[in-house]
Amino acid sequence: MKRLKKRQIGRVVCTILQQLAITTPVHVVYSWGITNKTATQINVSMNGRKRFIAALMMEVYGFNYCGKLYITLNSVKQTFGLYTEKNGMLHEENSDIPFEELGKFLDTIIETGGRSQQEHYQRLQEFLHRR
């Protein structure tokens, strides 16, 4: 299996960060509680073959999800992939996130868990009243 060069990884991660900055309001990104961002490569299975792909790893501390997220880029299909790490294993959440939906999809995973804005607000209120 061929590992990627640092320059390749850097280009992909730069594209991911640029797209995130363009499509996602700053206050939304700040709400994710990102403590670490790292350009890396992950070993995934594609079409039955294992290979390394470049990824942006972010440690997030959101309301719905806390842990490591890995965002990948498929430049051929012009989509992003999202992997979460649980117990040291990578789990694919979605491999076909459209470019313009990246921020919204990440916010759903990290903060709202797919709930409507009203449901999310109610859950936040319940959480705050328990404290």
Q: What residue spans do the PLM features occupy?
A:
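Negatively charged, low-complexity tracts enriched in Asp/Glu with abundant Ser/Thr
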Residues: K2-F63
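Context-gated lysine
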Residues: K2-K6, K37, K50, K68, ...
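Mixed-charge, Lys/Arg-enriched low-complexity segments
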Residues: K2-V12, G88-R131
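Intrinsic disorder/low-structure terminal segments
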Residues: V29-G33, R51, G62, T79, ...
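Intrinsic-disorder/low-complexity regions
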Residues: T35, I42, M46, L73, ...
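Intrinsically disordered, low-complexity regulatory segments enriched in Ser/Thr/Pro
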Residues: Y65-I97
